[in-house]
């Protein structure tokens, strides 16, 4: 998330989805 600067939206959304699940 914070580490990712370029793909903060796409990567974050996918990572967040996994965290929520």
Swiss-Prot record:
Family annotation (PROSITE patterns): NDPK, NDPK_LIKE
Reaction(s) the record says it catalyses: a 2'-deoxyribonucleoside 5'-diphosphate + ATP = a 2'-deoxyribonucleoside 5'-triphosphate + ADP; a ribonucleoside 5'-diphosphate + ATP = a ribonucleoside 5'-triphosphate + ADP
Pfam families with a match to the protein in the record: NDK
SUPFAM superfamilies hit by this protein: Nucleoside diphosphate kinase, NDK
Cofactors (names): Mg(2+)
E.C. code: 2.7.4.6
Subcellular location: Cytoplasm
A molecular-function term among this protein's GO annotations: metal ion binding
Keyword tags: ATP-binding, Cytoplasm, Kinase, Magnesium, Metal-binding, Nucleotide metabolism, Nucleotide-binding, Phosphoprotein, Transferase
A Gene Ontology BP annotation from the UniProt entry: nucleotide metabolic process
Keyword set includes ATP-binding: yes
Catalytic residues (UniProt): 4 (pros-phosphohistidine intermediate)
InterPro entries: NDK-like_dom, NDK-like_dom_sf, Nucleoside_diP_kinase_AS
Nucleotide-binding recorded as keyword: yes
GO cellular component, one term: cytoplasm
Subunit structure of this chain's protein: Homohexamer.
Family per similarity comment: Belongs to the NDK family.
Protein function: Major role in the synthesis of nucleoside triphosphates other than ATP. The ATP gamma phosphate is transferred to the NDP beta phosphate via a ping-pong mechanism, using a phosphorylated active-site intermediate.
Name of the molecule in the record: Nucleoside diphosphate kinase
């Amino acid at each position: 998330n914070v580490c990712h600067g370029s793909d903060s939206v796409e990567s974050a959304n996918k990572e967040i989805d996994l965290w929520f699940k």
